Amino acid sequence: MVVRIPLGAKTRSGPFHANMIESWFLNDPGLVIVFPSNPQDAYDLLVEAAALPDPVVYLEHLGMYGLRGGMTGWGDRIHMQVDTESVAKAIESGDTYKLGKANIVRGGSDATIVTWGAMVHVAMKAAETLS
């Protein structure tokens, strides 16, 4: 079972704007939490979540919705060709593809910024400013 939950701030986002509820679910045993940061993550995590026997909470930041011209709610361009084959091959072979694995977006030696979801784009801007 996959439960998709929109959250996060964006213009006219109604009851979703003030809640970042991932911490509510993180300590529940047997519950898988996913939070995509780009269109490829969104596809891969949804397909992989649907194949799991465990319940999955699929959190979706509203800033990633309605990408006009590939723009996030923060003005970042994330045009992406989505690969629909790699995750399917991993599932068919019984492997995990992205679940349970960290995605290191940028390496470095001075500081560590840990984030998830749409905030990856904000963290990347911060890292660029700090470098």
Where are the language model's segments positioned?
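Conserved thiamine diphosphate
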Residues: 1-114, 119-122
